[in-house]
Amino acid sequence: EWGVVKAVRSKGIFVMMDIQALKKIEISPHLIACHVRRYLDTLDLLALTIEGVSAYAAAHIAQNEIEEAISDINRCWNEDHLYMLTPSFLLNLIVKHTGDGSLNAVYTLLRQNLGIGRSIPALCKTEKTAEDYELYEQCITALNQLYAGRQEDFSNRTAKVFRYIYDYVTEKCKNLGYYDSAMAVYDGSALWK
């Protein structure tokens, strides 16, 4: 059960707000705009680059690592609130095999930033959605393709997974009213001038 508690030393833990009260809190989009923008930029960069990076990593991933990733995904899929980590296990496996250079440094940061999404209000639900089932199936399919030695299929599927996440999250941020505030954090077009 979700809520807010206050711990007072030597007195105990007191419930300050239950789940119903938490749902009534409205957070202004500009207060979280930087976090939303960083998350969207992370997803965008992953969607743009993951196909080549996963193709490179695929050649170095051992069968037992694939089995472990599948096992981790299946374990978390059946635990409340952990099912959202499914794409993280796929990304973790890839990051482990990006070498020691700048690519690894960038992808390690992207992996860390992927967790931002879990802290954005109303972006994640406690119940599994059709999109969650789709992501689960796609991640497992990608890993099974890699396990079968089909590295190109693995990298193509992985690219589709992260493009799907980017498109889904972008649309959800627009529906929640976060997108415009996030895009106003800085002028992204200046990067290409």
Role assignments for model-derived ranges:
Residues 1-48, 52:
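Short linear motifs at protein or domain termini
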Residues 51-141:
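Mid-protein regulatory/catalytic core that forms ligand/cofactor-binding pockets
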Residues 18, 100, 150-151:
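Short, solvent-exposed helix-helix connector turns and helix-capping sites enriched
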